[in-house]
């Protein structure tokens, strides 16, 4: 089965972060932060992170087209998300830009062991969870790195529906046959 990992850098030291990546044999980190910087944790700024990863023998790619910080559309069908940031990202997932980004990610992940990375440690509080839904529906096993020994398999969002081959997150009772 095709496998892809997710990880959040959180407040870890760069050494702790690299240790997690090595424990799961990650060969490439795909940064899915819209803005690849961190004021609170400067070790995860794009330049510093890329340098540390390169020194550890791990490739780095920034994929802004999979980044979060999206705003919901006025005609959003993803009303199941009360969190407007998640609703906005769910709306964005139906765009050609997202689909292209997802394909680029999949192309990388068939060649190397890849982890998508954002800042939030808890994947269910990050847009990585929605990206993981899209990948899981495409037949990928997505594992969320928690510790050196633990990577939790992704479970699809409970209110996810597939309508006309698109992932949607309708409010309860919407789009029911």
Locations of regions flagged by a protein language model:
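Residues lining hydrophobic/aromatic ligand-binding pockets adjacent to catalytic sites
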Residues: 1-177
């Amino acid at each position: 089965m095709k496998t892809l990992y997710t990880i959040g850098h959180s407040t870890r030291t760069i050494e702790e972060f690299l240790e997690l990546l090595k424990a799961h044999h990650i060969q490439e980190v795909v940064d899915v932060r819209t803005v690849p910087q961190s004021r609170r944790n400067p070790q995860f700024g794009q330049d510093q992170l890329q340098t540390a990863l390169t020194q550890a023998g791990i490739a780095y790619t920034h994929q802004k087209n999979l980044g979060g910080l999206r705003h919901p559309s006025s005609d959003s069908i993803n009303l199941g998300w009360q969190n407007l940031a998640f609703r906005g990202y769910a709306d964005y997932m139906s765009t050609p830009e997202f689909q292209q980004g997802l394909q680029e990610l999949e192309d990388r992940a068939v060649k190397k062991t890849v982890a998508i990375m954002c800042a939030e440690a808890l994947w269910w509080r990050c847009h990585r969870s929605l990206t993981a839904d899209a990948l899981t529906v495409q037949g990928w096993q997505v594992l969320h790195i928690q510790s050196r020994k633990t990577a939790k398999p992704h479970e699809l969002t409970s209110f996810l529906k597939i309508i006309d081959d698109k992932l949607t997150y309708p409010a309860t009772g919407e789009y029911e046959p």
